[in-house]
Amino acid sequence: MIKIRFTHRLLPVLLLALCAFAPRGFTQTPPTFSQVVVFGDSLSDDGNIRHLLEDQYFISYPGGDYNYSDGRFTNSSDTDPSSDLYAGTWHEQLERDFLGLPVATNSLDGGTDYAFGGATTADGTSSRTVISNPTPFGGGQLSVDVDNMGKQVQDYFDDRTPDPAALYILWGGGNDLFDDHSASHVTETATNVAELVKTLARAGARSILVPNVPPLGVVPHYKDDPETAAALNAASATYRGELNTDLDAAVATLSGEGITITLYRLDVYGLFYRLAANPEDYGFTNISDSAQGQPVDPDQYLFWDDLHPTTAGHHQIAAAAFDLLSGTAPAPAQALNISSRLDVGTGEDVLIDGLIITGSGAKKVIVRGLGPS
């Protein structure tokens, strides 16, 4: 079977899949929202990219012909191997299984999920190239323009009146850093997200969920490229800090304008290391390889392809988001009780949470019990 690949990594790393908190031993009171509105990339796209490709090229991708769940960059009961436990992306599982709300379907078919695989946090559109074309095209390249998150928000305003009782999700940044992980671009990406928070709030949004990104270099795609993996991990860590700072400033600015919002910050970066330290606690036996097309149980794998999580991974993100919304997630300043080995980068001096590691070679460290997170 010929596969389609996007040269600019459709998913910000799906790696996200990883985030999760330990099993719950207490009663949680779910928050009440009227609906969920989603802006993002392939981690949250449940049909917009497929809609575009069907319209322009008569290709149902992602879909069953390419061993993906229908319209989603993950697995399902009809993929090889099939999932027996979970269905849908993280926000679909959050809405359906945790919040008891209707699922936000893709916006091009009339729903409130405006996410597009390949989207960045910028305005306008991004041109993504599809290669290894299937029959009957027989080679060459296909391009598709996807709505970036700034345009997604504007399209939402054009379509609907903002609902103050809704939960708004803004999850991007992965594709931005995949495209360019320079320090200046990391700063620009964090600024973009904070500006979108202010834009939504000024229009009437009052509950906004903003995840950061996991260490992007841990996805299977970079297993054999340690230098790029280390650079992406470093950029992800920097983004985590800069996003927090920019969100603090955004909330302060809005408060000065008389606008009060509830801002939920999902620390996917920190959540990954909790999962990596004890994957078996979350039902995983493999958190480094892709399950797609392999004779394995995908419900025990974190990754479906070389970038995106399985529905089991998506489930852990949904569970972590619900803990956050319910006020039962670990406090951000709580120490991470973990032990994890990772590459942190190259260069004469590498900064790791306030420590400078000297030397010009690649640094490998074992992180134990870091705090605060």
PLM regions: where:
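Bacterial N-terminal signal peptides that target proteins for export
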Residues: 2-12
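Basic side chains
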Residues: 9, 72, 206, 363-364, ...
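A sequence-level detector for low-complexity, Ser/Thr- and acidic-rich stretches
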Residues: 198, 209-211, 219, 320, ...
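Intrinsically disordered, low-complexity segments enriched in polar/charged residues with Gly/Pro
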Residues: 7, 293-294, 342-343
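Bacterial N-terminal signal peptides
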Residues: 11-21
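Conserved active-site regions of diverse hydrolases
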Residues: 19, 26-330
